[in-house]
């Protein structure tokens, strides 16, 4: 059986794609080239479906949730706040999984930085 090798890209609609790309690169420290190619570090990726009525993604109109692995959640959230990002005060610790925080990008998408255990 043929299998996928990994996630090859994540694409989202935006009212101002150039500004949104710049926000992700600047605020999250992503080192991408002019075409958006970014080589992520090795690590696990979760693929999971949620109930259609979940409020975990924030707005009901948001159909997906982008989760980024980070080394230090507190440092990442402080970096985001320093850049004026809309960072939630909530942090969730899940035993055996890691620590989760949330930020809303300039287009209103909830994004989840996660510090794995």
Segment roles from a protein language model:
Residues 21, 31, 85-88:
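A generic "structured core" feature
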Residues 24:
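Terminal peptide-recognition signature
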Residues 28-63, 103-106, 110-117:
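Conserved short beta-strand elements that form part of the metal-binding/catalytic scaffold
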Residues 16, 72, 105:
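Acidic di-acidic motifs
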Residues 59-85:
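Mid-chain, well-packed structural core segment of small domains
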Residues 1-9, 78-117:
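Vicinal oxygen chelate
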Residues 1-21, 64-66, 117:
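N-terminal beta-strand motif that seeds the catalytic metal site of vicinal oxygen chelate
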């Amino acid at each position: 059986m043929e299998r996928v090798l990994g996630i090859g890209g994540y694409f989202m609609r935006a009212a101002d794609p150039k500004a949104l790309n710049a926000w992700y690169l600047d605020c999250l420290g992503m080192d991408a080239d002019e075409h958006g190619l970014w080589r992520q570090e090795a690590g696990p990726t979760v693929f999971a479906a949620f109930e259609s009525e979940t409020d975990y993604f924030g707005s009901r109109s948001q159909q997906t949730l982008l989760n980024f692995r980070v080394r230090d959640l507190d440092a990442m959230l402080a970096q985001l706040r320093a850049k004026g990002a809309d960072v939630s005060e909530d942090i969730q610790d899940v035993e055996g999984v890691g620590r989760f925080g949330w930020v809303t990008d300039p287009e209103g998408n909830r994004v989840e930085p996660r510090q794995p255990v």
